[in-house]
Amino acid sequence: MAYSSCLFEPGFGTELILRRIDGAIQVRSNADPTFYSFVDLGGPGGPVVIHHGSSLLENPYIPYQCMDGYLSGTG
């Protein structure tokens, strides 16, 4: 399983950890263990994002640039 990470808040050391699982992307945070996001890429209506708990979700900026970089790096 390929893992990747990117800085979510530069200067604060918060990273998002991404990994691909059966055609979807799991996103976790190194700083907030309650943050969990799962992006199903194979839905007929496009990607489906499932979020679970945490203050990170209150920030409207979920770094899709990280996901784009991850997808282009893992194919």
From Swiss-Prot:
Top-rank lineage group of the source organism: Eukaryota
UniProt xrefs under Pfam families: DUF2647 (PF10839)
InterPro entries, per the entry: Uncharacterised_Ycf68
Gene Ontology cellular component list: chloroplast
KW Chloroplast (keyword) present: yes
Key words of the record: Chloroplast, Plastid
Key word Plastid present: yes
Compartments where found: Plastid, Chloroplast
Record family assignment: Belongs to the ycf68 family.
Protein name stated in the entry: Uncharacterized protein ycf68
Species: Pinus koraiensis (Korean pine)
Higher taxonomy: Eukaryota, Viridiplantae, Streptophyta, Embryophyta, Tracheophyta
